[in-house]
């Protein structure tokens, strides 16, 4: 089992039935295999806004989940994240991330560094052994306290 398979299983166990997304992110295929319906968008912000609307309509019982590619895909998401943060809307955001060996090469976009001011919580999965605990903390953050976007960046060589 690889990292994206494990994350998809956790999402399903947490009751996720739909996931908005923008290609290309390996989690999209793995989530579909577990029965999570991917809803594809033509722009990252649209996917985030749909996840935001899903969370708003479900009264805190379910959360919008969105997956997108790393780099430009993650960069295009900041507007939607800022809106969800400003309105205290809990959404789970799962961007891809650069492979560990290239994470600190400039000008790579690192979600965990760039989104700190517009999200409730942000973590990066560096090793497969972190997946269970990082995802547990992500869902705890979604369920507790003020709402807001929770980000789990999935490095390409781990997930």
Regions found by a protein language model. Name each.
Residues 1-159:
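N-terminal alpha/beta PP-like core and its mobile active-site loop of ThDP/TPP-dependent enzymes
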